[in-house]
Amino acid sequence: METLSRLLVFMSLFSGLVSGFALQNLPITSFEESYTQLFGDKNLFVHQDGKSVRLTLDERTGSGFVSNDYYLHGFFSASIKLPSDYTAGVVVAFYMSNGDMYEKNHDEIDFEFLGNIREKEWRVQTNIYGNGSTHSGREERYNLWFDPTEDFHQYSILWSDSHIIFFVDNVPIREVKRTAEMGGHFPSKPMSLYTTIWDGSKWATNGGKYGVNYKYAPYIARFSDLVLHGCPVDPIEQFPRCDEGAAEDMRAAQEITPSQRSKMDVFRRRLMTYSYCYDRARYNVALSECVVNPAEAQRLRVYDPVRFGGIPRRHRNGKHRSKRSRVDGTESI
């Protein structure tokens, strides 16, 4: 418990850092001016200030909303408080997509929050793909250094033409740099911002072992501090209407600083539980954008030597420490 507290303090000391510009200076948009309800009827509720939204999943339906504009690059953020108690099978998603415009070759940049059985933590999954390349998954999964059901925490996506960075409470947790070999697999078409809650019983918790139990419904996810800071664009003409301030921010946010990278490395070494870059059972050769970090690779090999080390399952020793002990972030820093 002491080492977990130390990790919490360590991460919070640097939570004010955002690549290239100060997040606290970005304007917060109201629901009425920037978003439209996607589905869910009365399961979406906008609070009186117009700047906080409640999404509900019950026996009837989930719910969600989408930005009015498409964007070609930008910084997108929301403070989110996740449902508590038994949440197995529940998926809360905060993501960019253009699936409504490009049904067969759409792009996505995803934050997905995967519920769990009682007394087990929510897990966070990030993913990207372009041109409908869902067969080439680029997923990563993580635990968090806090309980996301107790209070609001900030989740952010920075998307430029050269890279994508995911943030949790302003701490960078993942960077994807565009490579020539990626081709159309890097998201490059205008996208809208989506926020949803829905029933993912078939896959979200332990591969579908545990589904949504509506005895615990309604499941309520709360959102505030919604930020859309980017270049709105006509999805057909793809000509951006980008103000100079947003354009300057994108130019300034091209690289993670050495200090930020150090904090990202701490997060990934302690709290990452899956990365496609190290999944030898899935990809014999890592994809072109993967930068192999020896510390990350070693930790994941210890966690699952079959998946991350390429060791045949019949060679595994039957006695191992529990998976939880390896992924809960309580190791010494």
Swiss-Prot record:
Extent of the signal sequence: 1-20
Gene Ontology CC terms: apoplast
Glycan-bearing residues: N131
Binding residues annotated for xyloglucan, in chain numbering: E112, Q125, T126, N127, H135, S136, G137, R138, E139, K202, W203, G207, R282
Top-level lineage group: Eukaryota
Tissues of expression: Expressed in 7 day old seedlings, roots, hypocotyls, rosette leaves, internodes between nodes bearing axillary shoots, nodes bearing flowers, flower buds, anthers and siliques.
Sequence ranges of Basic residues compositional bias: 312-324
CDD domains, A to Z: GH16_XET (cd02176)
Family: Belongs to the glycosyl hydrolase 16 family. XTH group 3 subfamily.
Protein name (database record): Probable xyloglucan endotransglucosylase/hydrolase protein 27
Recorded name of the encoding gene: XTH27
